[in-house]
């Protein structure tokens, strides 16, 4: 497993609409392998893996992470921020963060906020400034992006910890597929899509799908269980138990034919799956499957512990198994298979 790539993706700072640091990593890989690259109007990256007269398949992961944006600067030097995406309440107080200025300078600070019951409001970043002028002299302006200041770490037992695993694990899988299959003979035309602005409303998933117009889509994302050390039967997001196969969420109910086919292929190659349902939230799949006249879509990905906060934990074996499964699915997506998956008669 390429831990240096995962580290680079995790430590890149990219809230919605400001995903250039992640985009650059993907573009360097695509350029190195001389792949065609397109963009949608929001900045999503569309990499054409191969040419084929077969069906068109889209593999999608989002680039953005939850974070904050500078809203205003007080006379005393407090930097008021607003959340971008659904940042956990517990992660809105006393957290190291970094501000990325328009000049791409990184300025560390401490995030804090006012707690009222279970809510945290009036969030601000302290960079040690004593006045408005000192903040301005540091180059900070309203609109600058703020992300958690988290260093990627390798943990015991093939596990890793870092920020923005939602959805840099998906972006990592896009790159590994690009590397593995860049010169393979495939039965389908495959587009690897890194979408913009998922955390603020599944935006790039919609616009990128319009640009690709796929016959089938696989969306990569992550999720965690509310109680990280609950290993009971209801928890289908346990790290180390294999990738998640999301049967339904608030925005998408996956076609049973498609999920059954994924389960069959996974069993053939010996990859365990955790069949899961999200009672809250959704993924790019919600936007993807409603594009055009409808796109058969399934959501999969590695489970994590903790999410939408300063750091998550994942198991490298889950990531590798997800890569194995994606490769196997892509190599089996013949025109006949797609016809069978989309036949409603």
UniProtKB/Swiss-Prot annotation:
<dbReference type="GO" id="GO:0006508">
    <property type="term" value="P:proteolysis"/>
</dbReference>
<dbReference type="GO" id="GO:0046872">
    <property type="term" value="F:metal ion binding"/>
</dbReference>
<feature type="binding site">
    <location>
        <position position="166"/>
    </location>
    <ligand>
        <name>a divalent metal cation 2</name>
    </ligand>
</feature>
<dbReference type="Pfam" id="PF05343">
    <property type="entry name" value="Peptidase_M42"/>
</dbReference>
<feature type="binding site">
    <location>
        <position position="166"/>
    </location>
    <ligand>
        <name>a divalent metal cation 1</name>
    </ligand>
</feature>
<keyword id="KW-0479">Metal-binding</keyword>
<keyword id="KW-0378">Hydrolase</keyword>
<dbReference type="GO" id="GO:0008237">
    <property type="term" value="F:metallopeptidase activity"/>
</dbReference>
<feature type="binding site">
    <location>
        <position position="221"/>
    </location>
    <ligand>
        <name>a divalent metal cation 1</name>
    </ligand>
</feature>
<comment type="similarity">
    <text>Belongs to the peptidase M42 family.</text>
</comment>
<feature type="binding site">
    <location>
        <position position="62"/>
    </location>
    <ligand>
        <name>a divalent metal cation 1</name>
    </ligand>
</feature>
<dbReference type="GO" id="GO:0004177">
    <property type="term" value="F:aminopeptidase activity"/>
</dbReference>
<protein>
    <recommendedName>
        <fullName>Aminopeptidase YpdE</fullName>
        <ecNumber>3.4.11.-</ecNumber>
    </recommendedName>
</protein>
<feature type="active site" description="Proton acceptor">
    <location>
        <position position="198"/>
    </location>
</feature>
<keyword id="KW-0170">Cobalt</keyword>
<dbReference type="InterPro" id="IPR008007">
    <property type="entry name" value="Peptidase_M42"/>
</dbReference>
<keyword id="KW-0482">Metalloprotease</keyword>
<keyword id="KW-0645">Protease</keyword>
<comment type="function">
    <text>Has a broad aminopeptidase activity on non-blocked peptides by progressively cleaving amino acids off the peptide substrate. Aminopeptidase activity stops at the residue before the first proline in the peptide. Cannot cleave when proline is the first N-terminal residue.</text>
</comment>
<keyword id="KW-0031">Aminopeptidase</keyword>
<feature type="binding site">
    <location>
        <position position="199"/>
    </location>
    <ligand>
        <name>a divalent metal cation 2</name>
    </ligand>
</feature>
<dbReference type="InterPro" id="IPR051464">
    <property type="entry name" value="Peptidase_M42_aminopept"/>
</dbReference>
<feature type="binding site">
    <location>
        <position position="308"/>
    </location>
    <ligand>
        <name>a divalent metal cation 2</name>
    </ligand>
</feature>
<dbReference type="GO" id="GO:0070006">
    <property type="term" value="F:metalloaminopeptidase activity"/>
</dbReference>
<dbReference type="InterPro" id="IPR023367">
    <property type="entry name" value="Peptidase_M42_dom2"/>
</dbReference>
